[in-house]
Regions:
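Core beta-strand elements of the Rossmann-like FAD/NAD(P) dinucleotide-binding domain
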Residues: 46-56, 233-236
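Flexible, glycine/charged-enriched surface loops at secondary-structure junctions
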Residues: 12, 18, 92-96, 164-167, ...
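Short beta-strand to alpha-helix junction loop
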Residues: 1-6, 16, 71-79, 104-108, ...
């Protein structure tokens, strides 16, 4: 990141610091196709709205892990970019697939690298048992993230959790020695000591799975171009990295592969956007392109409601942790969708304390809460619709993978008022075929197989 920033400075690139994109400016052509004309951004320092008229827009806005209480994601990762695209009627793809990293600091979600297990750290339950030997006898603690996360939660649910509330397991690094921990895994020692008061050199660290990475997002092709349906390109918008769904990770990303994703598709998106604007024309701006955002902000700022932003956000995150996390069922997903509907009604009555314009973070948090509610509902609705278990999506009531019916991508579209009580009234789910590579004989190069460890 530092290298990237230094090169931007060297090239004289202008940064609009503390500007938050809140809307994608779109217009329809004569055939009803979506065209992009730029973005509307909110300047936090002044409270002013700015219209950026552009031929192309690149979304690199990160994920939406803050729909969950326990997450490794930063506080700003509320899915604003993904939500902006969704509200414009463009689809989101495979939104139900979310990766939960096994080793987050218990109760906090701060990530402890799986490099620790790569160095030989061991997961243990309350009795000190190396429980992964029971679940994945060949690779034990080095099993894929989704499997390890489920095993950890299962240990807790079956009463083998550690701590006064029996709600976590241990990451045991004590046998690695101080030199390995201090030189190869310095973040683990620093985080455990700072946030839990635990010294990994001498005692095991309490850990539990943490919401880490959204496999789904804004659908793109390998050029980074945003797709309007299965394969139709929307001229102008591009997306890359955590907010995008180019589908190189399938339903279950492998560790560190997101870094490769960022480098490859970030570069492709940038290069292709530059190439596109060389020949493209500006799409004329609609009259008063900032009107919708202005009305939304003023409505929130002037609302005389009594609901607190923090209370609504906390309720949403806790309910998503309880009902749509590592394990999911028809009942839990239906429950959380009911909660989200109730929260939407309460959101209409939300109170913003700060009525000013300069650095009004209270107002911005209210906007972010709206995006969180949108995305949490889509995740739960798509997860309920996929009645199987695959990768980062585990249904306890449908524990097996069902390739015959569900070897396909979910495409979610906004089709009505998101405040309507039934998601079916405003969310349309469709399917997109999975692309298989085949050899000259017409056989699959990589036929689907059951994972066994």
């Amino acid at each position: 990141l530092q290298t990237l920033f230094q090169n931007c400075v060297k090239l004289g690139i202008n940064f609009f610091n503390e500007y938050y994109a809140l809307d994608l400016i779109t217009v329809k052509d004569d055939d009803g196709n979506t065209q992009v004309a730029g973005v509307v951004a909110y300047e936090l320092a002044t409270g002013d709205l700015h219209v950026f008229h552009s031929k192309a827009v690149i979304f690199a806005t990160g994920g939406f892990g803050k729909i969950y209480k326990t997450t490794s994601n930063a506080h700003t990762l509320t899915g604003d970019g993904v939500g902006i695209v969704w509200r414009k009627g463009l689809p989101l793809e495979d939104i139900e697939f979310f990766q939960f990293h096994p080793t987050g600091l218990a109760g906090l979600g701060i990530l402890l690298t799986e490099g620790a297990r790569g160095e030989g750290a061991i997961l243990r339950n309350a009795s000190g048992e190396r429980f992964m030997e029971r679940y994945a006898p060949t690779i034990k603690d080095l099993a894929p993230r989704d499997i390890v996360a489920r095993c950890m939660v299962k240990e807790v649910l079956e009463g083998r959790g550690a701590g006064p509330h029996k709600d976590y397991v241990y990451l045991d690094c004590t046998h690695l020695g101080a030199e390995v921990l201090e030189t190869k895994l310095p973040d683990i020692t620093e985080f455990a000591r700072t946030y839990l008061g635990v010294d990994p050199v001498t005692e095991p660290v309490p850990v539990m799975p943490t919401a880490h990475y959204a496999m789904g997002g804004i659908p793109t092709n390998t050029a980074g171009e945003v797709l309007q349906n299965n394969d139709t390109v929307v001229p102008g918008p591009y997306a890359a990295a955590d907010c995008a769904r180019v589908s190189v990770h399938g339903s279950n990303r492998l560790g560190t592969n997101s870094l490769l994703d960022i480098n490859v598709f970030g570069k492709r998106s940038g290069r292709n956007a530059v190439e596109y604007v060389q020949t493209a024309d500006f799409v004329p701006l609609p009259e008063d392109p900032a009107k919708e955002v202005r009305e939304m902000l003023e409505g929130l700022r002037n609302n005389q409601g009594t609901e607190r932003i923090a209370v609504l956000r906390k309720t949403l995150q806790e309910e998503m942790d309880a009902n749509a996390q590592v394990f999911r069922t028809e009942e839990t997903l239906t429950n959380v969708m009911g909660t989200i509907h109730d929260l939407r009604q309460r959101y209409k009555n939300v109170h913003v304390d700060d009525k000013g314009k300069r650095f009004n973070t209270d107002l911005l948090e209210a906007v972010e809460l709206g995006f969180l509610l949108d995305l949490a509902e889509i995740v739960a609705y798509a997860a309920r619709n996929r009645k199987e278990s695959r990768g980062g999506h585990m249904r306890e009531d449908y524990p097996d993978r069902d390739d015959a019916q569900y070897m396909q991508h979910t495409m979610a579209y906004l089709t009505g008022d998101p405040h309507s009580p039934d998601p079916e009234d405003h969310i349309k789910l469709d399917w997109k075929p999975v692309v298989f590579t085949k050899n000259e004989a017409g056989e699959l190069n990589y036929p689907p197989m059951e994972r066994k460890y």
